[in-house]
C-alpha cells in the first residue's frame, strides 16, 4: 500500500503502519443495536432534514444509546486537520475556506433535533490567525442563544496554549470544556507529533482557572503500560481536570498506528476505580467508551458532586443510570 484513498502518497509513518495487518477484535468489543423510540424519531428527523452529525458519519457504535438520551456530536472547521495524530480518522491537509456561517447551522441542527445536550468538536486550524478560536466560541454562543435549555460540551485542540485564543473560547462558557490528552509521555511525540504533553495539561489548567468544568480522555492500546496510564490520570487531575473518559484504541485503517494491546474490561474497571481514588468528579471507562459518550450524564454527575445547581431542563442528567459501554456493565 503506497497510495492513500484520497490519491496522495503515503507518509513514511503511514507506510510503516500499513505493513502491519489490521488486528482481529476480541469478543468483548461489541455493541447491541437497541433502537428505542427517541432514537427512531431522531433518526427519521435527521434523514428528513438532511442534518449531519459525527455520530452517523463516523459510524459510532454508541449512537443508539446517546440519541435515545437526545445527545449528539457535531464536527466544525471542515474535514481536513492541520495536524496529524497517528490514531485519528480525520485526514490531514489544507483545510477548506473558513465558514463563518457554520455556527448558525450547527445551532439550528441542535434545535431541529431537539437535543438536550450536544458535543461540539473540530479540527485544528493552524492556518487561521486565531487558530479557529472564534469559530469554536461562536458555535457555543449560537447553540445557547437558540437553545437556552441545551447543554454544550466543547472539545477543543490546544490552540498552542495561546492565552488570547483560549480566553476567546472560554468566554463562550460551555457546560464542559474538554481537551483530550489521549496518551502517556513516553509515546506522546510518536502518537501526537503536533501536540505537547505539558502544553495539553496547561490548557486544562487554564480552563479550570477560568471556572469551567474540565474533561479529558485517555486511549489505551497505543504502547502505554497500565502504570503509565495511572500516572497520566494523576497528571490530569493535578492539572485541574474534573472528568475523564478511558477507552480502547480501535485502528481506523491500515495507515494508522497498530493496536499494541487489547485491554480487558477488568482492567478498565481497575483504572476507573483508580481514577475515582485520585479524585475525579466523574469517570467513564470501557472498550467502546468514547470521549463524548454519555457526555451529559458525566457533566450531571460532576455538578451533583460539586453541589452545584443544575438547570431544570437538564435535571434528568443527574438521575442514577447505567451506561451500556462502561466496563462494569460488560462484566455483569
From Swiss-Prot:
It holds the Pfam family LIAS_N. Binds 2 [4Fe-4S] clusters per subunit. One cluster is coordinated with 3 cysteines and an exchangeable S-adenosyl-L-methionine. SMART domains: Elp3 (SM00729). It catalyses: [[Fe-S] cluster scaffold protein carrying a second [4Fe-4S](2+) cluster] + N(6)-octanoyl-L-lysyl-[protein] + 2 oxidized [2Fe-2S]-[ferredoxin] + 2 S-adenosyl-L-methionine + 4 H(+) = [[Fe-S] cluster scaffold protein] + N(6)-[(R)-dihydrolipoyl]-L-lysyl-[protein] + 4 Fe(3+) + 2 hydrogen sulfide + 2 5'-deoxyadenosine + 2 L-methionine + 2 reduced [2Fe-2S]-[ferredoxin]. Transmembrane segments: none annotated. GO terms for cellular component: cytoplasm. One of its GO terms (molecular function) is 4 iron, 4 sulfur cluster binding. Pathway: Protein modification; protein lipoylation via endogenous pathway; protein N(6)-(lipoyl)lysine from octanoyl-[acyl-carrier-protein]: step 2/2. [4Fe-4S] cluster 1 binds at residues 55, 60, 66, 292. Its cofactor is [4Fe-4S] cluster. It is found in: Cytoplasm. Disulfide bonds: none annotated. Residues 67-281 form the Radical SAM core domain. InterPro entries: Aldolase_TIM (IPR013785), Elp3/MiaA/NifB-like_rSAM (IPR006638), LIAS_N (IPR031691), Lipoyl_synth (IPR003698), rSAM (IPR007197). Its EC number is 2.8.1.8. Keywords: 4Fe-4S, Cytoplasm, Iron, Iron-sulfur, Metal-binding, S-adenosyl-L-methionine, Transferase. [4Fe-4S] cluster 2 binds at residues 81, 85, 88. It comes from the Bacteria. Belongs to the radical SAM superfamily. Lipoyl synthase family. This is Lipoyl synthase. It comes from Beutenbergia cavernae (strain ATCC BAA-8 / DSM 12333 / CCUG 43141 / JCM 11478 / NBRC 16432 / NCIMB 13614 / HKI 0122). The gene is lipA.
Amino acid at each position: 500500500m503506497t497510495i492513500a484513498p484520497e490519491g496522495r502518497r503515503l507518509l513514511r509513518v503511514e507506510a510503516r503502519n500499513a505493513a502491519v495487518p489490521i488486528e482481529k477484535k476480541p469478543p468483548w468489543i461489541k455493541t447491541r443495536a437497541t433502537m428505542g423510540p427517541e432514537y427512531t424519531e431522531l433518526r427519521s428527523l435527521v434523514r428528513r432534514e438532511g442534518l449531519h452529525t459525527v455520530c452517523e458519519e463516523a459510524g459510532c457504535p454508541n449512537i443508539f444509546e446517546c440519541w435515545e438520551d437526545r445527545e449528539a456530536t457535531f464536527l466544525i472547521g471542515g474535514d481536513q486537520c492541520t495536524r496529524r495524530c497517528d490514531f485519528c480518522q480525520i485526514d490531514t491537509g489544507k483545510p477548506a475556506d473558513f465558514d463563518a456561517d457554520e455556527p448558525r447551522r450547527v445551532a439550528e441542527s441542535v434545535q431541529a433535533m431537539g437535543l438536550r445536550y450536544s458535543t461540539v468538536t473540530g479540527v485544528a486550524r493552524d492556518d487561521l490567525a486565531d487558530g479557529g478560536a472564534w469559530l469554536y466560541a461562536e458555535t457555543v454562543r449560537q447553540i445557547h442563544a437558540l437553545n437556552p435549555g441545551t447543554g454544550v460540551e466543547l472539545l477543543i485542540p490546544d490552540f498552542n496554549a495561546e492565552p488570547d485564543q483560549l480566553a476567546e473560547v472560554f468566554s463562550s462558557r460551555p457546560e464542559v470544556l474538554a481537551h483530550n490528552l489521549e496518551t502517556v509521555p513516553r509515546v506522546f511525540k510518536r502518537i501526537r507529533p503536533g501536540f505537547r504533553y505539558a502544553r495539553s495539561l496547561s490548557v486544562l489548567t487554564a480552563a479550570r482557572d477560568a471556572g469551567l468544568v474540565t474533561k479529558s480522555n485517555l486511549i489505551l492500546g497505543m504502547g502505554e503500560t497500565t502504570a503509565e496510564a495511572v500516572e497520566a490520570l494523576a497528571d490530569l487531575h493535578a492539572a485541574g481536570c474534573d472528568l475523564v473518559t478511558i477507552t480502547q484504541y480501535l485502528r481506523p485503517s491500515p495507515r494508522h498506528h497498530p493496536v499494541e494491546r487489547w485491554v480487558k474490561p477488568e482492567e478498565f474497571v481497575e483504572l476507573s476505580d483508580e481514577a475515582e481514588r485520585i479524585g475525579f468528579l466523574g469517570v467513564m471507562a470501557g472498550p467502546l467508551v468514547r470521549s463524548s459518550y454519555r457526555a451529559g450524564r458525566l457533566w450531571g454527575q460532576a455538578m451533583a458532586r460539586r453541589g452545584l445547581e443544575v438547570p431544570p431542563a437538564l435535571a434528568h442528567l443527574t438521575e442514577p443510570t447505567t451506561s451500556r459501554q462502561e466496563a462494569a456493565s460488560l462484566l455483569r
